[in-house]
């Protein structure tokens, strides 16, 4: 059987397209083969994050989180702060405009599932505080829902 050059090129092109499809499918399904990939968007019940574990990490603390969304600091992410220093209403950019309270200090991040305290959540700035807190925040660094936050007493790790 004689195959024309045009047919051979066409078959080669289809072969590349097929391999590209396999590659895209494999890359896209990579996480499906291992851990579950969570959306960044909040579910119907809202974005939630909890501190499941705490352990020393040098002079800082390593927190282990459980969340129902995948954090991204340019989208929905986490705010961590010292609970004795600020309320959940204070740890967002809309503290004064929406909640009528003085804006506090927090550390924004998307480290997941573990995070080591730093910045405004560092142990070096806790000033005697012994409760670390976390809450979901949006891309504008506003707390998504001030009723949804989690705090853990950590004095035994300091």
For each predicted feature, which ranges?
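Bacterial N-terminal signal peptides
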Residues: 12-27
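Boundary at the C-terminal end of the N-terminal hydrophobic targeting segment
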Residues: 29-35
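N-terminal secretory signal peptides that target proteins for export/translocation
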Residues: 1-12
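Long, low-complexity serine/threonine/glycine- and acidic-rich segments characteristic of extracellular
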Residues: 60, 66, 70-157
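N-terminal targeting/docking segments
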Residues: 10, 16, 50-54, 63
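Short, compositionally biased P/S/T/A/G/V-rich stretches that sit at domain boundaries
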Residues: 35-58, 66, 157-158
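Disulfide-bonded cysteine motifs in exported proteins
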Residues: 6, 36-37, 42, 128, ...
């Amino acid at each position: 059987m004689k195959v024309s050059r045009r047919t051979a090129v066409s078959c080669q092109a289809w072969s590349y397209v097929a391999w590209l499809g396999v590659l895209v499918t494999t890359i896209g399904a990579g996480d499906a083969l291992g851990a579950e990939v969570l959306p960044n968007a909040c579910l119907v019940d809202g974005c939630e994050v909890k501190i499941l574990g705490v352990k020393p990490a040098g002079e800082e603390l390593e927190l282990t989180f459980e969340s129902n969304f995948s954090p991204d600091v340019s989208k929905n992410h986490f705010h961590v702060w010292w609970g004795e220093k600020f309320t959940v209403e204070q740890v967002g950019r809309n503290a004064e405009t929406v909640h009528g309270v003085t804006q506090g200090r927090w550390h924004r991040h998307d480290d997941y599932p573990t995070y080591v305290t730093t910045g405004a959540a560092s142990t070096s700035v806790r000033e005697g505080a012994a409760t670390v807190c976390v809450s979901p925040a949006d891309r504008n660094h506003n707390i998504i829902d001030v009723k949804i936050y989690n705090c853990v007493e950590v004095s035994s790790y300091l």
